[in-house]
Amino acid sequence: NNCHEKLPHVKIGPAPNISAVYPKSNNPADVQAADLYTAIRNWLYLDIAVYGVYNHQVWAYLEENEALPDMEPGDLEILKSAECDFIAFNYYNSSTVQAYPAGTERATGKKDQQLSDSQEGFFAGSDNEHLPYTEFGWQIDPTGFRTTINQIYSRYRKPLIVTENGLGGIDKLEDGKVHDNYRIDYLRNHIEQMNLAVTDGADVFGYCTWSAIDLISTHQGFRKRYGFVYVNREDFDLKDLKRYRKDSFYWYKGVIASNGGKLEG
């Protein structure tokens, strides 16, 4: 509200990280676990931003775990009166979860992201045998990108912009070049699925990759690189910090020049 009042001609929207969530199996317990995790992972933030209410499943979950937020008189009314103009979101990978009964040992899901996708008594991150993984244990799921776009648009009917989408990998500099076809394949497949979501009827007005240049990853430092431009340094060795354009740089330059029409390279 404050932004709209001070800048009435400016549009504003949230930018959370959102992903499709799959149940490990068709076991109703796994389906229920995936449903709860979806509410926590995705709808908690967006329900507040768009509808001005806490998701009912998440509220019950927080209450059961004695983690309800402190609310002052009038807070709910302020939330309810707020309005966003669009939804920005980041997508890197989908998630797969299974039921995690209290007092039991986790059966699967030991990879990077899955370890944080876990709450005993509710859900646990799990492997997905139908999807490939990056060397850092992230699911590669372009189809899940289309699913995520359609889920968000169907639920909220707000224009969408993708603010981050990319692949973090260990790039190798060889004779001043970086041949990162894996990144090109990842981005091409995701853009194709985004185009299909638009064909489905979703209103997507923008797409941004992550990232233009290598930067420090919060999980793996400079070992995990996302950029189109290689920075010649390591975690504890700055080297010469020289920049090198990767193969993906030239590929994406063509994608931009063709407004997404040229995806083959």
Residue ranges and their predicted role:
Residues 1-265:
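Active-site region of glycoside hydrolase catalytic domains
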